[in-house]
Amino acid sequence: MDFFYIGVMSGSSLDGIDIALLKQDDRSRLLATHYIPMPEDLHAELLGLCSSGADELARAAIAEQKWCRLVAQGVQTLLQDQNMVPAQIRAIGSHGQTIRHEPSRGYSIQIGNPALLAELTEITVVSDFRRRDIAAGGQGAPLVPAFHEALFDDNKDHRAVLNIGGFSNLSLIESDRPVEGFDCGPGNVLLDAWISSQLHESYDKDGAWSASGKVDSALLQKLLSDQFFLTKGPKSTGREVFNLGWVKHHLFQSKTLAPEDVQATLLELTALTITDSLKSAQPITRELLVCGGGAHNKALMKRLAELLPDTEVSSTEKFGVNPDWVEAMAFAWLAHCCLEGVPANRPTVTGAKGRRVLGAIYPA
């Protein structure tokens, strides 16, 4: 039977909200999309909630209502554009907005008010995907490797899927064993934070500013000495660890560098932590498929290819899947798994003690 789902993803980069319409039968097909740029005031509020501050509970409650109403408007626009009505959609899979992720302390917090979203859209909402995995001893992240396996596993060995959003994560796909995966470290988060602090730009288009600088090996080695990079998976991370303050802490201990050299070094950090992780976990990788915003960073993609000379590095576009929409598609698929009672976590990815059905259901 064919079902229609909507997936909603707002990642750690906080740049906007991705909404994807999916047709789900024996495979997942992307039908339509809608993108909402994050309003500046809401971006600032959400970024502030990612670190300790005053009156956090009230601020989070207000921010998630604003976020939710934006999503509801986006869903309605998407349906209108497709001449569809809410009754045709089986469910919305809403990731929400992560404001804290500390699985070592037993929690990951995504705000988004799924009850209000169900009320505003008149569509069943599935949300809160991470906490069941954490309850079972897992990291609660990354959750997309199971979807990567479903989407890109055509019985070819030695394939990996790399998602580069605010943070980077790998899915290792082999035909004879369950998918494996983990967070590698910062993706765009440090690159975006540094260029914002220096040039007041939201991101480094094509990695051009990074490409104009030179890597400082001393700073790079200091950054690579972080305990996260020395830890084997399963592992996940977030803004609690990697943020502008983390960069400035290491810069304080270094010689004065040109801003573009810092950016070049941060790009090298992203590239090296990805490729070193891949070589360690899957020594032979014939094909690396890249999705997420980082797939558009030409300097980063070029560096990945240089560091992996025996691996074909390409965008998921090669499979006819737009790299910008893979995560939103994944949460539509996760909603489908929840309603079908299909476990969607992978213990080989998160470290949970078993497979679990993920998500909480808010009926229309």
Swiss-Prot record:
Keywords: ATP-binding, Carbohydrate metabolism, Kinase, Nucleotide-binding, Transferase. One of its GO terms (biological process) is amino sugar metabolic process. The keyword S-adenosyl-L-methionine does not apply. One of its GO terms (molecular function) is kinase activity. ATP binds at residues 11-18. Pathway: Amino-sugar metabolism; 1,6-anhydro-N-acetylmuramate degradation; Cell wall biogenesis; peptidoglycan recycling. It is an enzyme of class 2 (transferase). It catalyses: 1,6-anhydro-N-acetyl-beta-muramate + ATP + H2O = N-acetyl-D-muramate 6-phosphate + ADP + H(+). Its EC number is 2.7.1.170. InterPro entries: Anhydro_N_Ac-Mur_kinase, ATPase_NBD. NCBIfam families: PRK09585.1-3 (NF007139). Belongs to the anhydro-N-acetylmuramic acid kinase family. Catalyzes the specific phosphorylation of 1,6-anhydro-N-acetylmuramic acid (anhMurNAc) with the simultaneous cleavage of the 1,6-anhydro ring, generating MurNAc-6-P. Is required for the utilization of anhMurNAc either imported from the medium or derived from its own cell wall murein, and thus plays a role in cell wall recycling. This is Anhydro-N-acetylmuramic acid kinase. The gene is anmK.
